[in-house]
Design a protein with these regions (language model features):
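His/Asp/Glu-enriched, well-ordered alpha-helical/loop segment
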Residues: 225-230, 248-249, 286-370
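Metal-associated gating/positioning segment near the N- to mid-region
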Residues: 48-116
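C-terminal cap of metal-dependent C-N hydrolases
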Residues: 6-14, 340-342, 359-400
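Catalytic core of soluble alpha/beta enzymes
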Residues: 182-197, 211-297, 313-315
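Divalent metal-coordination and catalytic microenvironments
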Residues: 23, 28, 55, 66, ...
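N-terminal metal-binding scaffold of metallo-dependent hydrolase/deaminase domains
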Residues: 1-42, 373-375
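Conserved beta-strand scaffold positions in the cores of enzyme catalytic domains, especially
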Residues: 47-52, 165, 388
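Metal-coordinating catalytic core of metallo-dependent amide/deamination hydrolases
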Residues: 101-116, 122, 130-241
């Protein structure tokens, strides 16, 4: 059966384990899930191709619902500055920070951006990721933001991984432009972006001294008018009330939430906005983690994502996310699986297509190199994915 909504609170623990069944796939869809004898009685399987997963655990493909996949250049040296004790402002003054990525992304050709992001997608696919949300936000001008979105569009056509596109010009305020002027320019360009790109979502970095709550309200309301679904980088550094605000906007997800307030937790529990947690970023920045247990125990729907980006979390590692979620945020492995599958599907408006092994859904699934999904956390930090099936085709097979 189709899961028609995300799993909230204690329901995140229920993953619907099935033993001794086989999955029948026709074209790119799941046709049936049943014991072999039932399938043989109902279907002619003489010509069926068999993928033997005997003794292995099979899960839905993972969905990485928050990434900054496309950027130019790299900032490896900056990480060493951070380790030596420099704060963000010092790094900015040395030519690092988001401004460095903006400069390099503006300078990069579309082909260079495609080549770099394609390699990242290859890495993600090997770890069982079959759908990725990808944001713009390293252009901070119409030309480069659109270039990033077109890269996402082209990658979606050439790569096995499905991509979901998010317009995020409101990621930072570009040098030499006043905030009000920049906000007005973003709003003026919304119609053009909607018309000329495949961007489905609009996202804002809602933070003190960047886009405050009033700025965010103005931007999200304008984006909604133009038909964008909404996301928000909310309550990461300072509790501005972003979570409770985006629930009133019926946003698809509120992401980060390290500093979410009690009112924010309550609003997320009562609404349908997914709370997307990004433990890799907290780990990389050596900050406290988002309050996963508090959110779950209050009845929220949690997703987990990598936040892959060139600065605060240069990692697409799903094994790392799983380890941090379980060991640093006290989530169970079942809750983590829910957060990387069905709830992550909800976070990209794909609940009816992907996120669970169900009849009629897209045949996106992964086979682990172990009989139990417990291997995902038991074999710490190691990729347990042996085979990836995307739209009914084997797109990755580990040969050891």
């Amino acid at each position: 059966c189709h899961a028609t909504q995300a799993k909230k609170g204690k329901d995140m623990q229920e993953i619907g384990r099935m033993i001794g069944v086989e999955i029948l796939i026709q074209d790119d869809k799941i046709l049936a899930i049943a014991p072999r004898a039932e399938l043989e009685a109902a279907y002619d399987l003489a010509q069926a191709e068999v993928l033997n997963a005997m003794g292995h655990s099979v899960l839905p493909g993972f969905i990485d619902s928050h990434t900054h996949l496309v950027w130019g250049g790299e900032r490896a040296e900056e990480f060493s500055w951070r380790l030596s004790g420099m704060d963000y402002m010092e790094i900015m003054n040395r030519g690092g920070g988001i401004a460095a990525s903006v400069e390099k992304t503006r300078a990069a050709s579309k082909e260079e951006l495609i080549e770099a992001a394609n390699k990242r997608l290859d890495s993600m696919l090997r770890m069982g990721v079959t759908t990725v949300e990808a944001k713009s936000g390293y252009g901070l001008n119409l030309e480069t933001e659109r270039k990033q979105l077109r890269v996402v569009e082209e990658l979606n056509q050439i790569h096995a991984v499905d991509l979901v596109s998010t317009y995020m010009a409101a990621h930072a305020i570009p040098k030499g432009i006043g905030k009000e002027v920049y906000i007005s320019s973003i709003i003026e360009e919304l119609a053009e972006i909607r018309k000329t790109t495949n961007a489905e979502f609009f996202d804002v970095f809602c933070e003190k001294n960047v886009f405050e709550l009033a700025d965010t309200k103005k931007l999200l309301e304008a984006a909604a008018v133009h038909g964008f679904s909404l996301k928000l980088h909310a309550d990461e550094i300072v509790p501005l009330g972003g979570a409770e605000f985006v629930v009133t906007m019926k946003a698809t997800s509120a992401d980060h939430l390290l500093q979410v307030s009690e009112d924010g937790v309550r609003a997320l529990a009562e609404g349908n906005t997914i709370a997307t947690l990004l433990p890799g970023t907290a780990f990389s920045l050596q900050t406290d983690y988002a309050p996963a247990r508090r959110l779950i125990e209050n009845g929220c729907a949690l997703a987990l994502a990598s936040d892959l980006n060139p600065g605060s979390c240069h990692s697409e590692s799903i094994p790392l996310i799983i380890a941090l979620a379980c060991l640093q945020m006290s989530m169970t492995i079942e809750e983590v699986i829910t957060a990387l599958t069905i709830n992550a599907a909800a976070a990209v408006n794909r609940l009816d297509i992907i996120g669970s092994l169900a009849v009629g859904k897209q045949a996106d699934l992964i086979i682990l190199d172990a009989p139990s999904y417990f291997q995902l956390i038991y074999h710490l930090g190691v990729n347990s994915v042996k085979t990836v099936v995307k739209k009914g085709k084997v797109v990755y097979q580990r040969d050891y």
